[in-house]
């Protein structure tokens, strides 16, 4: 898959779920940032379908986390695949971002 597709699900007072599919890269990061900027409340980014992420994508995640924190909300990355999870660990963003793997927060 080229590019990034995402869907946003809002269910009452539960966290907003944003499902990511494809590649979060320089071309896609601004679209994701725009979509997340309009959300209020806790956000779960379902990363199970995210196949690739580059530096611009990582920066977009950090900006989203900062925006959520400024509003008093939480951003949680849910089930990143092996390649994405490995990169998050290598650049030590797993110490900055809240990540839930297979139902467990870390």
What do these predicted ranges mean?
Residues 1-52, 62-106:
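STAS-like cytosolic regulatory interaction modules
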């Amino acid at each position: 898959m080229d590019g990034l597709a995402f869907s946003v699900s809002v269910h009452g007072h539960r966290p907003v779920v944003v499902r990511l599919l494809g590649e979060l890269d320089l071309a896609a990061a601004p679209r994701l940032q725009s979509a997340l900027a309009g959300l209020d409340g806790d956000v779960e980014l379902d990363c199970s379908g995210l196949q690739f992420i580059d530096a611009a994508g990582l920066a977009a995640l950090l900006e989203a986390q900062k925006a959520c924190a400024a509003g008093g909300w939480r951003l949680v990355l849910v089930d990143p695949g092996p390649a994405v999870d490995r990169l998050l660990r290598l650049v030590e963003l797993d110490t900055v971002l809240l990540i839930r793997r297979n139902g467990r927060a870390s």
